[in-house]
């Protein structure tokens, strides 16, 4: 708690049963899982969409794949009316093929190595940079506003140990905070 403070108590529903797998690839799959859970009276509180909710699997773009999610806002509303919260997976890495890669590089919102460059091919978001935090909050804010109940923040442990963060600290210090 000395580093990051005490967390607030999570909402009660977050302690319930989560239905997840790698991955539900469509609105139809998510709705089908929810329907079967309720039909079979299986207590559950969260439907989690892992890597496949993006247009390209594992390519975090903070948008539901339009060809597989006809109306994500309505899906979220409908799932909520059935007693489900919805969780979405994401990761803080952006490959050169990701649509946000050029913007993140241009704006300098990434962790650097000792030479001030990308530590490896992907951009890793630098959450010690207030501009990065604002960018990230805007992306997630759109999803929360739509009705998403939780975000699975994955792969923080992969941050480069030899990186230099905007706050001047090394990756060894910032690793997995």
Question: PLM features: what roles do these ranges have?
Answer:
Residues 1-45, 76-78, 85-86:
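Carbohydrate-recognition beta-sandwich/jelly-roll modules
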Residues 43-177:
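Aromatic- and carboxylate-enriched substrate-binding clefts and catalytic-loop regions
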């Amino acid at each position: 708690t000395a580093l990051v403070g005490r967390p607030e108590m999570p909402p009660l529903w977050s302690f319930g049963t989560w239905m997840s797998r790698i991955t539900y690839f469509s609105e139809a799959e998510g709705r089908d899982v929810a329907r079967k859970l309720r039909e079979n009276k299986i207590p559950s509180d969260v439907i989690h969409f892992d890597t496949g909710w993006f247009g390209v699997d594992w390519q975090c773009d903070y948008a539901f794949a339009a060809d597989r999610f006809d109306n994500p806002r309505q899906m979220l509303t409908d799932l909520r009316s059935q007693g489900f919260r919805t969780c979405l997976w994401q990761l803080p890495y952006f490959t050169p093929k990701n649509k946000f890669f050029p913007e993140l590089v241009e704006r300098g919102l990434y962790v650097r190595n000792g030479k001030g460059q990308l530590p490896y091919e992907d951009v890793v978001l630098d959450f010690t940079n207030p501009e990065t935090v604002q960018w990230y909050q805007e992306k997630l804010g759109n999803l929360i506003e739509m009705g998403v109940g939780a975000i699975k923040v994955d792969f923080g442990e992969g941050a480069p140990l030899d990186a230099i963060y905007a706050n001047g600290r090394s990756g060894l210090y910032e690793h997995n905070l």
